[in-house]
Every structure is written in C-alpha cells, then in structure tokens.
Amino acid sequence: MRKAEVKRKTKETDIYAELNIDGKGNYDIATGIGFFDHMLSLFAKHGLFDLKVVAKGDLEVDTHHTVEDVGIVLGNAFLKAAGDKKSIKRFSTFYVPMDEALVRVSVDISGRSFLYCDLPLKAERVGNFETENVEEFLRAFAYNFGITLHVELLHGGNSHHIIEATFKALGRALDEALRIDERAEGIPSTKGIL
C-alpha cells in the first residue's frame, strides 16, 4: 500500500498527517476550522484516501497559515506515498455538480508544479473559513506534490457549493490519476521520469 506520514512545525502551525492512497475513504480531520475539516473529509471520502490530519495554527490571526500549511503537508504526503509512480494512470479530469455549481478539476501527476484556478467566489467567508484560502490550499498542495492542477468553475454562484464541488472533484480526479494501470509498464512518460 502507498502510505505516508508527514509532520511540519513552524512558529505559526504544527501539523501532522497520515495518508493511505489505497484506502477506503476513512478520515479523521481536526484543523480547528470547521468548514475546512468538512472539505478535507469530503476530499478523503470521495478520493477513497484514508486520511488523518491534526493541525494547530494561529487561528487568532486568521485561517490562512493553517490552510496553506495543511496544503503543504498534504502535498508532501501525496508525493511521498505516490512513490516511484510506476504504472499510474497519471492524468484525470473530473466534473462534480453541487446543486447549481459545476466544477471541473484536471490533474497531471507530472512532476511539474502548476496551478490554474478560476473559482470566482462571491462570499468572503463560509463559517470562519476565508474563501480566498481555497486557492492558497490548492497552490500549496499542487506545488508540494509536484502536479499540474487545473480547477475551473463552469457555472454556479453559491460559494459553499462551489468549494464543496471543488474538493470532491479533486479527490475523484486524484483517485483516478493515481490508480495503477495493470497494462502499463514503468513510468508513464516518454522521458522515463516524472
């Protein structure tokens, strides 16, 4: 099984994560940010990843440091757990509707860090979660995992629905891209490296 454990401690945050890519969607999330916990739970459940995240951050300042640093830790955990990436499918695109919202997420487990994010969010907050931190999380995750990630809102207006569809689609897309293809041999690249 492809598993990882990552710890990261700074003056702003103290984060621990356990990941099993080949899990069943079990999760135990405690970041101190209720809405973010909910999104990470959806991500794990729909990606079928077993995920534990325990984060303590300077929430008296705001949620930015905690959300971004969880993205860093999870990106590192996925990178570590993915191992040599032999025989993975590598690419995936997933669409997820949430009522009026429709979000498309495309991933390439490429070894090249890039984020394209087009998620216009009308609300500044959902609960105590600053919505601008969605992009901060996605950037930290993509850059620390070393993936190309495109996230686009095709239509919708409710910020909660848009963010929820995003995390579900990200989980589904990663599940597909990281799946082992029994027909494939070696690294899925003509370069021989990802």
From Swiss-Prot:
Family of this protein: Belongs to the imidazoleglycerol-phosphate dehydratase family.
Annotated PROSITE patterns: IGP_DEHYDRATASE_1, IGP_DEHYDRATASE_2
Keywords, in A-Z order: Amino-acid biosynthesis, Cytoplasm, Histidine biosynthesis, Lyase
Annotated GO MF terms: imidazoleglycerol-phosphate dehydratase activity
Major localization class: cytoplasm
Pfam families: IGPD (PF00475)
GO cellular component, one term: cytoplasm
Pathway(s) this gene product operates in, as recorded in its UniProt entry: Amino-acid biosynthesis; L-histidine biosynthesis; L-histidine from 5-phospho-alpha-D-ribose 1-diphosphate: step 6/9
Catalytic activities: D-erythro-1-(imidazol-4-yl)glycerol 3-phosphate = 3-(imidazol-4-yl)-2-oxopropyl phosphate + H2O
Descriptive protein name: Imidazoleglycerol-phosphate dehydratase
EC number from the UniProt entry: 4.2.1.19
A GO BP entry: L-histidine biosynthetic process
Subcellular location: Cytoplasm
